[in-house]
Curated annotation (Swiss-Prot):
Name of protein: DNA replication and repair protein RecF
Source organism superkingdom: Bacteria
Function text: The RecF protein is involved in DNA metabolism; it is required for DNA replication and normal SOS inducibility. RecF binds preferentially to single-stranded, linear DNA. It also seems to bind ATP.
Cleavable signal peptide: none
Any GO molecular function: ATP binding
One Pfam short name: SMC_N
Family membership noted in the UniProt record: Belongs to the RecF family.
Assigned GO CC terms: cytoplasm
Taxon lineage: Bacteria, Bacillati, Bacillota, Bacilli, Lactobacillales
Residues annotated to bind ATP: 30-37
Length: 364
């Protein structure tokens, strides 16, 4: 798939822009704080209905306005697909083929993107919530039912936590009813995640082995607050874990076990990647991103769109070459950069946009 055009209105520092893209490589060139990353953010937003930089939709709207529009024409194997997202004071409207979508899970997955940004290094060093977010975003693109199951789980979890906080003495029967719903949706979420990570690990191992010149074996482990030694009896194990945790939950007024507490661990040659070098961390993240591309291709039979936010300067020559090998293949890529110095080995057939103060000054 590839994005033919993008129209943005009242998005960040752009009052309005209408851009036609190259099916291969598109480069946004400009100094910092001019609006390069905002275009990548708009593309990401068009795909996933959310920003990778902020949790607040208000941050995306131009400071002089109270609404925004992001729309694009996506080219897939089945033909052209118009996409629209409109943020207004009354809420969000998403459309596919000009038809309003009632649920986000009906919209997300139409356009697949893989984002690689400098802050992705925090996947290894950051908090567990960042790694859960990574799973949720990537898995949600390729398996819409996951978003539905996760949403239902979070709804019951919020209901349970609110009940615990509001009552010093609880109705054990009512709590058991909530627990059964948590077990149902929680087990679905865990099984989705395990299946996703098993497939991602397979692709990432091959990529990391190649990048490390056959020296490092990468493994990915799902760390669950629910024991996973008998996956066929997961519901029973989950139920028992909630019973064991109930005294703790009543005291702390929240839920101590479940997929909202889970994490991922990365190992290089069986050693915790947390203790690896910065170079190993960059190789690991690059391996994951390249694996995402392969995984999305294998499931959707479409090539995702690659977004590279000022990452070339973060990579050494060998890692740049591995990334460039992917770019040179049949994948639409968007790159932001302050200089073309790091892009000497890119294909000649590219489109360069010069960005200045929220304006596209030139195209070549």
């Amino acid at each position: 798939m590839w994005l033919q055009s993008l129209k943005i209105k009242h998005f960040r520092n752009y009052q309005e822009a209408d851009i036609d893209f190259h099916p291969g490589l598109n480069v946004f060139l400009g100094q910092n704080a001019q609006g390069k990353t905002n275009i990548l953010e708009a593309i990401y937003f068009l795909a996933l209905t959310r920003s990778h930089r902020t949790r607040s939709d208000k941050d995306l709207i131009h400071f002089t306005e109270n609404d925004l529009l992001v729309s694009g024409i996506l080219e897939k194997k089945t033909g052209k697909v118009p996409l629209d997202i409109n943020l207004t004071p009354k809420g969000r409207i998403t459309k596919v083929n000009h038809l309003k979508q009632s649920k986000l899970s009906d919209y997300i997955g139409t356009m697949n993107v893989v984002l690689f940004a400098p802050e992705d290094i925090q996947l290894i060093k950051g908090s567990p919530s960042l790694r859960r977010k990574f799973i949720d975003i990537e898995l949600g693109q390729i398996k819409p039912v996951y978003l539905s199951d996760l949403s239902n789980y979070n709804h019951v979890l919020k209901q349970r936590n609110a009940y615990l906080k509001a009552n010093d003495k609880v109705d054990e029967t009512f709590l058991t009813v909530l627990d059964e719903q948590l077990v149902d949706y929680g087990c679905r979420v865990i099984r989705h995640r395990l299946d996703f990570l098993q497939k991602l690990e397979s692709f990432a191992q091959d990529k990391h082995w190649d990048i490390s010149q056959n020296l490092e074996k990468l493994t990915v482990k799902y760390l669950s607050s629910i024991p996973l030694h008998q996956i066929d009896n997961l519901e029973e194990t989950y139920r028992f874990s909630l019973i064991i945790s109930r005294k703790r939950d009543l005291f702390k007024k929240n839920t101590g076990v479940g997929p909202h507490r889970d994490d991922i661990a990365f190992f290089i040659n069986q050693m915790d990647a947390n203790f690896g070098s910065q170079g190993q961390h960059r190789s690991l993240v690059l391996s994951l991103k390249l694996a995402e591309i392969k995984l999305i291709e294998s499931i959707t039979k479409e090539t995702p769109i690659l977004l590279l936010d000022d990452v070339m300067s973060e990579l050494d020559n060998s890692r740049q070459l591995k990334l460039l090998e992917t770019i040179s293949q049949d994948i639409q890529t968007f790159i932001t950069t302050t200089t073309l110095e790091h892009l000497k080995n890119l294909p000649q057939d590219i489109k360069i946009f010069t960005i200045q103060q929220g304006q596209i000054m030139s195209q070549s």
